[in-house]
């Protein structure tokens, strides 16, 4: 009766085994990383006390549900003017060729946290004390990194640590500049000293206690030599560090490469609290279907849940513009697809609606314990995704109304390889709906969803 279902279980078990063995190379991100990132609420201007406040909230309210990473996003080396909400402040040059604003940097061309924003870094301590604080809460610490080497280090001809006489100007690719933040040059990885520079910054981050780095301006366009350089530097730094690549969209043609060298990578450009952008994520998800697994995860981007844009970078300060139904769809789809879950809102300002979204253990289990998610069908008004479940014959199913009106979304159990009776459980309500045979149907609001667990009786 269940031949097709048995084949599906066997295939997912085989895929899980080989993905798990592959992931042991760095033993990080064996399940999709779960955490918080400062960008969506603080842009380039987060301060140390705000990072600590979010860490405190996570440790008290979220850690027991699996949330663990606290990530400081970009421009931590830049002294933002008070009240500034400028997202990407460009550097300009003085008559002698030097750069303004000048970023905090050590003698080896390695950026350091700005002490005005991160007072514990004063005296060259870097992020060590902040990381220690976050680790003391039982959490992990991450930072954002722009690809390459600071242009000001190239101008200053900063020596590259670990080399004999090689300076920053000898390893930079001065034709490679990020179009939306001009602080860095790319690295020419064929030049002697380029890998040593990456080795030096990763050893610095490891000495601080960094557990996660998000490298930006590296996945679009896809820069395989530099990606391999960061990977090698992590392998040699003496600490387990997860590697995240940004921005999207990462080319699907490079899926084999990115699976080998990164732990997560962006499928799309920046995602914000807009239904049209959420619809596009459904298309990206189909493109990357079947690629994710232990140690390597396609990433939808940070989650638009909670208080956003307190200091930029997009739109006025606000709670997420998503409706309650859209928030359920947002959270449910990130979970069933097994995308990394990085919260973007300011956690201490969460209301009940936000806390209920991110503390449902049965919903989070779909993200952490699912296997081989795949799209069952999609049309103009409905979409259904299914995931098997590690250690069980049960299945997870997401029913999504992507149309403009409330309507019934149908699940044909035969398409799951099931011909007998099933028990359907509503994961958001944490309650069994009933026993069904052949099909299950639910009336769902426009832009809403149902997240289910299907148990074969």
Label for each model-derived stretch:
Residues 1-24:
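Bacterial Sec-dependent N-terminal signal peptides
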Residues 32-38, 68-73, 140-145, 206, ...:
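Structural recognition of the beta-strand scaffold that forms the well-ordered cores
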Residues 59-133, 137-206, 210-212, 217, ...:
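Aromatic-lined carbohydrate-binding/catalytic grooves of carbohydrate-active enzymes
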Residues 170-176, 189-190, 196, 240-346:
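Glycan-recognition surfaces
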Residues 328, 334-337, 342-344, 378-418:
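Carbohydrate-binding surface patches
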Residues 329-377:
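Catalytic cores of secreted or luminal carbohydrate-active enzymes
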Residues 414-429:
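Solvent-exposed beta-hairpin/edge-strand motifs
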Residues 435-457:
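C-terminal beta-strand-rich structural cap/linker in extracellular carbohydrate-active enzymes
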């Amino acid at each position: 009766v269940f031949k097709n279902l048995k084949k599906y279980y066997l295939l997912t078990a085989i895929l899980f085994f080989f993905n798990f063995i592959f992931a042991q190379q760095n033993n990080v991100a064996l399940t999709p990383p779960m955490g918080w990132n400062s960008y969506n609420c603080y842009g380039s201007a987060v301060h140390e006390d705000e990072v600590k406040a979010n860490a405190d909230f996570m440790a008290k309210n979220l850690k027991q549900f699996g949330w663990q990473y606290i990530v400081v996003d970009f421009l931590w080396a830049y002294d933002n003017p008070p009240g500034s909400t400028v997202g990407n402040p460009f550097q300009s040059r003085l008559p002698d060729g030097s750069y303004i604003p000048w970023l905090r940097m050590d003698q080896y061309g390695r950026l350091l946290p700005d002490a005005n924003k991160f007072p514990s870094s004063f005296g060259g301590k870097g992020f060590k004390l902040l990381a220690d604080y976050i680790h003391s809460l039982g959490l992990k610490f991450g930072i954002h990194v722009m690809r390459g080497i600071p242009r000001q280090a190239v101008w200053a001809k900063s020596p590259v640590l670990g080399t004999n006489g090689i300076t920053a100007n000898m390893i930079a690719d001065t034709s490679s500049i990020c179009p939306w933040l001009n602080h860095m040059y790319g690295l020419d990885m064929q030049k002697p000293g380029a890998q040593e520079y990456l080795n030096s910054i990763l050893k610095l981050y490891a000495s601080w206690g960094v557990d996660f780095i998000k490298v930006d301006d590296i996945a679009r366009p896809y820069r395989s030599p530099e990606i391999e350089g960061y990977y090698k530097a992590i392998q040699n730094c003496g600490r387990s560090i997860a590697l995240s690549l940004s921005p999207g969209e990462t080319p699907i043609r490079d899926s084999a490469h990115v699976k080998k060298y990164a732990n997560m990578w962006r499928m799309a450009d920046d995602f914000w609290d807009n239904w049209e952008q959420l619809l596009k994520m459904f298309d990206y998800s189909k493109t990357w279907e079947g690629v994710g697994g232990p140690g390597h995860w396609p990433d939808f981007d940070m989650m638009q849940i909670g208080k956003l844009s307190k200091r930029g970078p997009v739109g006025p300060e606000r709670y997420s513009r998503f409706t309650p139904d859209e928030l359920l769809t947002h959270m449910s789809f990130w979970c069933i697809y097994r995308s990394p879950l990085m919260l973007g809102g300011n956690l201490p300002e969460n209301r009940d609606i936000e806390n209920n979204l991110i503390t449902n253990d049965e919903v989070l289990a779909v993200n952490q314990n699912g296997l081989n998610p795949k799209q069952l069908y999609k049309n103009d008004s409905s979409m259904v995704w299914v995931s098997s479940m590690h250690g069980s014959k049960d299945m997870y199913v997401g029913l999504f109304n992507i149309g403009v009106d409330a309507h019934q979304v149908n699940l044909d159990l035969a398409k799951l390889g099931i011909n007998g009776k099933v028990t359907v459980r509503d994961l958001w309500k944490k309650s069994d709906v009933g026993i069904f045979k052949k099909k299950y149907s639910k009336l769902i609001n426009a832009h809403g969803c149902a997240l289910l667990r299907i148990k074969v009786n």
